Each structure stands twice: as C-alpha cells, then as structure tokens.
Design a protein with these regions (language model features):
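Extracytoplasmic "Venus flytrap"
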Residues: 1-20, 51-56, 79-80, 148-157
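Extracytoplasmic
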Residues: 6, 42-44, 61, 70, ...
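Signal peptide-proximal N-terminal region
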Residues: 9-47, 167-171
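Short beta->alpha junction loops
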Residues: 34, 39, 49-56, 175-185
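Short, well-structured alpha-helical segments in soluble
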Residues: 49, 53-73, 136-138, 184-197
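Extracytoplasmic ligand/sensor domains, especially the bilobed periplasmic-binding protein
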Residues: 69-178, 184
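Structural motif
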Residues: 76, 202-203
C-alpha cells in the first residue's frame, strides 16, 4: 500500500536523524534540543522491515519473525487498524513495545488496548469531535445522514463516533450500512442512499 511505503520512508528518515547520519541535507535543517545524533541512549538504532500485506495474520507472522529472528525490541507501522490491533496483541505477548502507525480505530487504544501499545495518531472519536462543529457551522443542525461504512474495526468506530457527534448536534441518522472490506463496486449501494431521504452521505 502507498501508505506503508510512505511510513517506511518516514521511519528510515527518523533512524537517520537519530543516528546522526547523512540524509540528503535534511539533518542540517532539523534542530532538536534532545536529539544528539548518537542513537538512543548512545546506541545506534537498527531496523528491519516486514510486509503486513494489510492482513492481520500476515502482519503477526512478519512481526513474530522480526521479534524472534531479528531481536526487535519495538515494532511499529502498518496501515490498517485491524493489523495494528493484531500486531499489538502479539507484541504484548512477547513483551515488546508496539508503536501504532496508521490506525484510526478507537479500539486500538480503547477496548483492545495493551500495556505495551502506544499511539501518536488521532482516532475516530477525535476526528468526529473536531468535525462536528465544522459541519454544524457550515450545514446546520437539521440534516439527515446516511452512513456507508467499511466493515472492520476502523469503520465501526468511525461510524459510531461520527454518528454520536452529529446526533448530539441535532442531525438524524437515517441508516448505517456496512460494506465488505474488499468491495470495489459500490453501485448497488447508491440507489438505497438516493431513496433514503438523506441529504448527507458519510463514508
């Protein structure tokens, strides 16, 4: 996935910053009061990579290999909330830190939280809390919303959070429909939306 490739490039740049290595001129423009370019606690940061294939089982297998064969003490990355939750569980079992990458689901640090898991990325609840006042200011408090939701942990918590935030400001939720995760043709979902009386479609 493109998101995974972007994450990898960011991690590689971060390692170069931490280790004080040349990074195409970026380091000279970066200033930090805490990074000294000598790794972490004076130890050079090394990394290995794996491929989640955006599948929980493949992600767990890749992370397990990095922990057992490469001696990883921290796992990070993944561009799916389902992957993040699966790998976080493995890291908890192995006593390894998990720093969540792209996971937008509330559940990553909510109902599926682990003591070894951390996130720096915002979640569905935060998105809804920030979005609701903007929607209200721009579109008012008397809208009918129809939700088409990806049927997995991110979609569920995003739907729940946005519905709660918009209903609290007066919007009506007309319907919530979950779509298969691997769906590519959404044409069969359009007619019910158009016939629902909704004036807002939430994806």
């Amino acid at each position: 996935a493109d998101e995974g490739a972007d994450e990898l490039r960011a991690y590689m740049l971060a390692v170069e910053h931490l280790n004080g290595e040349g990074d195409g001129g970026m380091l000279s423009t970066f200033s930090s009061k805490t990074l000294e370019g000598n790794g972490i606690l004076g130890k050079k940061v090394e990394y290995v990579t794996g491929d989640t294939q955006t599948k929980s089982d493949a992600a767990r297998a890749s992370a397990k290999s990095m922990i057992e064969k490469d001696g990883a003490v921290m796992i990070t990355g993944g561009s799916s909330s389902g992957v993040a939750i699966a790998v976080q569980g493995l890291c908890q079992e192995a006593g390894v830190i998990f720093m969540a990458g792209l996971t937008h689901s509330n559940d990553t640090t909510g109902k599926d939280k682990k003591a070894n898991g951390f996130r720096h990325f915002f979640n569905g609840y935060m998105s809804a809390a920030a979005l609701a006042p903007v929607l209200q200011a721009r579109y008012g408090s008397d809208r009918n919303a129809y939700h088409l939701t990806a049927d997995y942990t991110w979609g569920w918590t995003q739907e729940e959070s946005i519905a709660a935030a918009t209903e609290a400001m007066g919007w009506n939720t007309v319907n919530k429909v979950r779509t298969p995760l691997k769906a590519t043709d959404f044409s069969s979902y359009i007619a019910p939306v158009l016939n629902s009386g909704a004036d807002v479609l939430v994806l």
